[in-house]
């Protein structure tokens, strides 16, 4: 597919023109780190991100065709900006019933959701993992049956949520059954909103697993997480079933939560990525996925030969193909200890917690990255002692968190209220102010406005959270 790169072309032409830069930014194109000649602002011809009529509009139209959406909008401030705009738009499109607006959301949401709730002043009803689910802070599989039940329960209270919000893929690589969830939402007249920050590449797999293709009304993609894009580059995608389609309204929502000085370096990166995606990227993506699947099988075969208590590489139909999630229990250690061992072998992971290590690959990783990782893990496997016990099932910890959860005030009241930081072990009975997170994955254990319970303290201590903010 032939693809233009109008933003890249304009900026390069300007950089070569010798024009006196009597405008921002202050470096005037003089190289300090090397990128400065390409770093500009909204000069004549450069267009304007939140009211585009020229090169940005053309580039976004290219992205829209590539992703197959009703419209794909650029963000230079990551999925966090897109999440806030998406929720604002869902609120704007919802019928007004005189009640406080409520969102139905899976509990493993990024803290950006809570910040949006504080800014927009809506309530959240949580979808929790089943009591039998293996406990993990990052995971919250939602079934169509569970969603139907939650919607029915809200309806019995005379309430309809303005949206259903799920994270897919999650930080451990788990994916939701989006077609089934979308069907439930469609039947109930509620938009499905997806945090797809980790899944921009899904559109370019042969089977097209992108949320918009699977029925989501809106989703955010962090292009920078899985595509060759500079940090901060993201998309807000609208499906044809989005509750708001007016372009000015969408751009207004993005502008509400964005800087008036968007980075043209990031915009060029998003623009250049269009050409990559229109080229041989899908073929390279298939090759990368195949290499990772081969690595998973090889590692799990070796783990089975060593009689490890669990497979080393997490696998299954509900796992995205581009994350390699390692279960450190296979080696008899914690995820953080495994990450340290890999770091000594010059392998830096994306995320580690007491149980898991997450490694993110893309087609930009050279073959030697795969080879170095396999060699390091095979060396660790060779040292595994016989008779390791199976890891303890932690599902009870999360069931207790759900059972004990009590919302004492609104999220907005908690986030904006007077607060103080105290040690976790002294927080029992206090009300959580700012979300208590470790980052990554930036998923709260205790939610703003909730009482700090014994179960919350157990989980915070397990995930290394030593202090938290509570209301005074």
What are these regions (language model features)?
Residues 300, 304-454, 459-463:
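Conserved C-terminal alpha-helix-loop-beta "cap" of PLP-dependent enzymes
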Residues 36-81:
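Conserved N-terminal alpha-helix of the aminotransferase class I/II PLP-enzyme fold
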Residues 467:
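Terminal helix/beta-alpha structural elements that buttress the NAD(P)+-binding lobe
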Residues 3-12, 78-312:
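Conserved PLP-enzyme active-site core in the AAT-like
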Residues 73, 125-127, 350:
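General small-molecule cofactor/ligand-binding pocket signal
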Residues 1-54, 190:
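N-terminal "arm"/small-domain region of PLP-dependent enzymes with the aminotransferase-like
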Residues 70-72, 99-103, 445:
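Short active-site oxyanion
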